[in-house]
Amino acid sequence: MKLLAFRRLLRIQRVVVRYRLDDLILELPMLPWWLRLLGAALPWRWLPRRKLELTRGARLRLALQDLGPIFIKFGQILSTRRDLLPDDIANELAWLQDKVPPFPPELAVKRIEEQLGAKIEQVFARFEREPLASASVAQVHAARLKSGEEVVVKVIRPNLEPVIRSDIAWLFILARLAERVSSEARRLHPVEVVSDYEKTIVDELDLLREAANASQLRRNFEGSPLLYVPQVYWDWCRPKVLVMERIYGIPVTDLETLRDQRTDFKALAERGVEIFFTQVFRDSFFHADMHPGNIFVSTRAPWSPQYIAVDCGIVGSLTDEDQDYLARNLIAFFKRDYRKVAQLHIDSGWVPAETKVNDFEAAIRTVCEPIFEKPLKDISFGQVLLRLFQTARRFNMEIQPQLVLLQKTLLNIEGLGRQLYPELDLWATAQPFLERWMRERVSPKQLLRNFQQQVEQVPHLSQMARDTLERLSQPHAHNAPPPEWKSSRHDWLGRLVGAVLLVGAAEVGLGQQLEAWPAWVMLAGGVFLILRR
């Protein structure tokens, strides 16, 4: 492992020199003077070097490509963090392609047999050794099960884990170094960025997780005319092997074939938007890697086109609170109610509670007013979210991984929709959906569901009160962090008092002694006083 790490260090150093990345680093304004002086003294900087006629973004992209698949995927993720990177670098990194030569089919067969505990011919009536596709983490082979179903077999590359561990370790070293030497770099939270990437890449190595994601998404859209997700064959899925139904669709970027079958492009673009908002707000579970390579269009019913989604390795979800704040933010934003947008960011905890709402409102207005001078159909929903996040970052907005995934997915969906139908008015499609969703949040059915959830909290009420009293009785209690239930964005005061009333009502209804009421009223008063402190 140490030898591998040392070799990777030498490789990184050679790539840095080849693409003059040291020049880019030394030009960073956040770099302290002593590190700039140290960098200027590096030995290779005194040697004659040919001039590179490349932009800084192109140099970084080529360097990441040279460093291999793990750095390529890191660059792809960085390209979605436009709240952190300049546009020219983010645009260049978006061109990174996660395509690498396939590994030998003999190794694929060996890994499949090891994972399934059976010979390949015992499981498959046919197995195509030439892969359909190959990427940095896995490659895909076509096959037919003994039972006759046409399937694809996804298999993780062998000997990948040691390389990933080594590369991730170096990324962490570089991120920690950046945080240590520059306060400006600390503001960008590079360690958190690498940590998010580590989670993403580790999750992609577990194909059982991807299978579960695909099953969930398929169930959410069962029978839907909007989206089809291939079936997972669980009997043949393992951590490093995934077997799914093979689909035959048209790549969404193959516009010529879609035209030949007379696809309704307007309906196709609008359905993409509807799928996104359905996943985010109805299901709170969304496919977060919907780039064109993972999206196909069914050949059936081109006048009512249906999407087909594959590769569910990366998904996102939102809490009820995040859903609510996001919907209200978007509606307020398009009504140009910047005060409400600023207040919602503070109320949600996305920016610190001590943020001055007037200053935040003014910053949002300055960034967003020029956007709204365009016709609504020309406004990019994804860019709106991006500018909002960039502004919020200046006010110390904490990284919200789920919102970053959502913004990236929205940019993909919107870009795809405009490619299919340039006149797409995303807001016209989204607004009715959001307003309907907000109305359903206060419908009798939803209120009853919320009421039932309140009842479920009743058994924990007395324990919560005891825990709070015990915490406050401890030395330095006022400096301790609040309990998780108190720091939640819910209005716990209202909930607890409501729960007390429910308990009393339940006791009366069950014929319990009415003398229990004073105790509950006292508890309510005590909790009220505690929470008011």
Swiss-Prot record:
Residues 126-494 form the Protein kinase domain. The chain crosses the membrane at residues 24-44, 510-530. One of its GO terms (cellular component) is plasma membrane. Its EC number is 2.7.-.-. SUPFAM superfamilies: Protein kinase-like (PK-like) (SSF56112). ATP binds at L132, A133, S134, A135, S136, V137, A138, Q139, V140, K154. Its main location: membrane. The active site is at D289. GO terms for biological process: regulation of ubiquinone biosynthetic process; ubiquinone biosynthetic process. Keywords: ATP-binding, Cell inner membrane, Cell membrane, Kinase, Membrane, Nucleotide-binding, Transferase, Transmembrane, Transmembrane helix, Ubiquinone biosynthesis. It is a multi-pass membrane protein. InterPro entries: ABC1_dom, Kinase-like_dom_sf, UbiB, UbiB_bact, UbiB_kinase. One of its GO terms (molecular function) is ATP binding. Pathway: Cofactor biosynthesis; ubiquinone biosynthesis [regulation]. It is found in: Cell inner membrane. It is an enzyme of class 2 (transferase). Is probably a protein kinase regulator of UbiI activity which is involved in aerobic coenzyme Q (ubiquinone) biosynthesis. Belongs to the ABC1 family. UbiB subfamily. PANTHER family: CHAPERONE-ACTIVITY OF BC1 COMPLEX CABC1 -RELATED, PROTEIN ACTIVITY OF BC1 COMPLEX KINASE 7, CHLOROPLASTIC. This is Probable protein kinase UbiB. The lineage of its organism: Bacteria, Pseudomonadati, Pseudomonadota, Gammaproteobacteria, Pseudomonadales.
